[in-house]
């Protein structure tokens, strides 16, 4: 079987039923590590379709309100990605407060704890909270992005 990796960036949708991995986690355009590109590079040659919420055309001037069409589209795309993905990787950047990532972890803990893998490094200001949520809901954890990707089945 020929393996292929495909990346889909927000706000495009998956057109067919493929094995998907949603990349939830720190973005903070310009400050957080672009870990999504590292994940995509590590997944080259695999059969996974990557749902990447980091988008090249993001505009930080968009009002983060439900009435803002672009913002609504982005958040809706992310929620649908989490809901429908076969796996979710949740990555916390130790230098980011990552409030949306904390919310994404909460969603995953209720919707798909068995299909979620969390990377939360030492030094993340809420690591204790993240560790307790992962322990309570039996969410898999990994020390590195490489380890998380190797755990995808």
Predicted regions and their residues:
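Conserved catalytic or regulatory cores that recognize and/or transform ribose-phosphate-containing ligands
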Residues: 1-153
């Amino acid at each position: 079987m020929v393996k292929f990796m495909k990346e889909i960036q927000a706000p495009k949708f998956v057109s067919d039923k493929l094995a998907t991995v949603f990349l939830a986690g720190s973005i903070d355009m310009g400050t957080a590590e672009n870990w999504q590109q590292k994940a995509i590079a590590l997944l080259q040659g695999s059969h996974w379709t990557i749902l990447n919420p980091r988008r090249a055309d993001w505009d930080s001037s968009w009002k983060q309100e439900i009435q803002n069409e672009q913002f609504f589209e982005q958040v809706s795309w992310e929620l649908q990605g989490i809901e429908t993905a076969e796996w979710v990787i949740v990555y916390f950047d130790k230098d980011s407060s990552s409030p949306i990532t904390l919310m994404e972890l909460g969603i995953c803990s209720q919707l798909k704890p068995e299909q979620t893998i969390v990377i939360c490094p030492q030094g993340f200001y809420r690591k204790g909270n993240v560790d307790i949520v992962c322990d309570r809901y039996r969410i898999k954890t990994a020390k590195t992005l490489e380890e998380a990707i190797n755990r995808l089945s």
